């Protein structure tokens, strides 16, 4: 009976030990485990939130980068259009200036031609008068007249 009584004594001691552990040891352990689980869950939630925030930030950065690229492309296009417009304006002005210079040169050449013609007319008239005077002052001689006309033609 000692074995049975020992077994019952051990069972009672074990029951007291379990009751003591349930009363004094178990609650702090459960609290520590719960706190640890809560911290881990909070950390995982924070990591998920940070991951979502990172994805949002990356999307926002991509949108801003795309907008900046579009704006830069638009500015470049505007600059190219303005450059083409300036080139076309310069070309038009150069063409107009060239036409004006050509017209002015033509007018100058026409004036010089008219002045030369007028001078030539005056010289021809003077030569004709000289020739007529010589013919009238000299005798009527066919060969002399022909020689004088050749001289007049050579002077022209």
Swiss-Prot record:
**What is the membrane topology listed in the Swiss-Prot or TrEMBL record?**
Single-pass membrane protein
Q: What is its main location?
A: membrane
CDD domains in alphabetical order: ATP-synt_Fo_b
InterPro entries in alphabetical order: ATP_synth_B-like_membr_sf, ATP_synth_b/b'su_bac/chlpt, ATP_synth_F0_bsu_bac, ATP_synthase_B_chain
Instruction: Kindly state one GO CC term assigned in the UniProt record.
Output: plasma membrane
Instruction: List localization entries.
Output: Cell inner membrane
Coiled coil feature spans: none
The cross-references to HAMAP family, in alphabetical order and at most eight, read: ATP_synth_b_bprime
Q: What does this protein do?
A: F(1)F(0) ATP synthase produces ATP from ADP in the presence of a proton or sodium gradient. F-type ATPases consist of two structural domains, F(1) containing the extramembraneous catalytic core and F(0) containing the membrane proton channel, linked together by a central stalk and a peripheral stalk. During catalysis, ATP synthesis in the catalytic domain of F(1) is coupled via a rotary mechanism of the central stalk subunits to proton translocation.
Protein name from the UniProt record: ATP synthase subunit b
Q: What are the leading ranks of the lineage?
A: Bacteria, Pseudomonadati, Pseudomonadota, Gammaproteobacteria, Moraxellales
Gene coding for it? atpF
């Amino acid at each position: 009976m000692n074995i049975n009584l020992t077994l019952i004594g051990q069972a009672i001691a074990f029951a007291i030990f379990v009751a003591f552990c349930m009363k004094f040891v178990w609650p702090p352990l459960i609290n520590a485990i719960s706190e640890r689980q809560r911290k881990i869950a909070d950390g995982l939630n924070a990591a998920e939130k940070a991951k979502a925030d990172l994805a949002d930030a990356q999307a926002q950065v991509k949108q801003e980068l795309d907008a900046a690229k579009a704006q830069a492309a638009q500015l470049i296009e505007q600059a190219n259009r303005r450059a083409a417009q300036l080139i076309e304006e310069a070309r038009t002005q150069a063409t107009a200036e060239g036409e004006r210079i050509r017209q002015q040169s033509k007018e100058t050449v026409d004036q010089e031609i008219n002045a030369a013609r007028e001078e030539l007319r005056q010289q021809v008239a003077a030569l004709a008068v000289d020739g007529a005077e010589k013919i009238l002052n000299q005798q009527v001689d066919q060969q002399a007249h022909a020689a004088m006309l050749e001289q007049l033609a050579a002077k022209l």
